[in-house]
Swiss-Prot record:
InterPro entries (UniProt xref): P-loop_NTPase (IPR027417), Thymidylate_kin-like_dom (IPR039430), Thymidylate_kinase (IPR018094)
Function: Phosphorylation of dTMP to form dTDP in both de novo and salvage pathways of dTTP synthesis.
Residues at which ATP binds: G10, I11, D12, G13, A14, G15, K16, S17
EC number: 2.7.4.9
Gene that produces this protein: tmk
MF annotations from Gene Ontology: ATP binding; dTMP kinase activity
Gene3D superfamilies in alphabetical order: P-loop containing nucleotide triphosphate hydrolases
Keywords: ATP-binding, Kinase, Nucleotide biosynthesis, Nucleotide-binding, Transferase
Annotated CDD domains: TMPK
Catalytic activity from the UniProt record: dTMP + ATP = dTDP + ADP
NCBIfam families reported for this sequence: DTMP_kinase
Organism of origin: Dechloromonas aromatica (strain RCB)
Family: Belongs to the thymidylate kinase family.
Name the record gives this protein: Thymidylate kinase
């Protein structure tokens, strides 16, 4: 039996990452083998590319190609083998993030994105994507309060992040059966109740 592939998405400051390990723990309590990973990253090569992607200035197409190169390695080394063994993968960001950040935020031609997506992972898509959405001003306030060094995406202007958010919502509108939008501007307890309900209904 093929495993399940769940991804977490959302603008910077949406708080999605704090729920990734929680969901993995919940699934492990049910006896499911779960791999927690992230993009860019997830493999030794992917983590090296992550450092470049998050910190080095580069041409849009270079950035996009490196994202997909890291993803191909990630799929080949971790995601596809785990799913083939019947294990689950919970990933912090995947291809929807490239659609939102490079496509929406940076203005990459959508046709180029779709061609790369098809080439790199064919028909493989997450079984479920949890999109954490909240007003941009709330997200920016959370980032400021975190008081940490920001990567190059987090340092982008407000209009960039608004385009990213709208691209995410557009993607969710076109794939409503896969992408479930979570109101991230509510209590952690309520968010986790909603996550458990969605995963139980859609994947278990």
């Amino acid at each position: 039996m093929k495993g399940k592939f769940i991804t977490f998405e959302g603008i910077d400051g949406a708080g999605k990452s704090s729920h990734v390990e929680w969901l993995a723990g919940l699934l492990r309590q049910r006896g499911i083998v779960v791999h927690v990973t992230r993009e860019p990253g997830g493999t030794e090569l992917g983590e090296k590319l992550r450092e470049l992607l998050l910190n080095e200035p580069m041409h849009l197409e270079t950035e996009t190609l490196l994202m997909f190169a890291a993803r191909r390695e990630h799929l080949a080394r971790l995601i596809e083998p785990a799913l083939a063994r019947g294990e689950w993968v919970v990933c912090d960001r995947f291809s929807d993030a490239t659609y939102a950040y490079q496509g929406g935020g940076r203005g990459l031609d959508r046709a180029k994105f779709l061609a790369l997506e098809h080439w790199v992972h064919g028909h493989l898509q997450p079984d479920l994507t949890l999109l954490f959405d909240l007003p941009l001003d709330v997200a920016r306030e959370r980032i400021v309060l975190a008081n940490r060094v920001l990567d190059k995406f987090e340092q982008e202007r407000v209009d960039f992040h608004e385009r990213v958010r709208q691209a995410y919502l557009e993607r969710a509108h076109t794939s409503p059966s896969r992408i479930r939008v979570i109101d991230a501007n509510q209590s952690i307890e309520n968010i986790r109740k909603q996550l458990e309900q969605i995963v139980s209904t859609d994947c278990l």
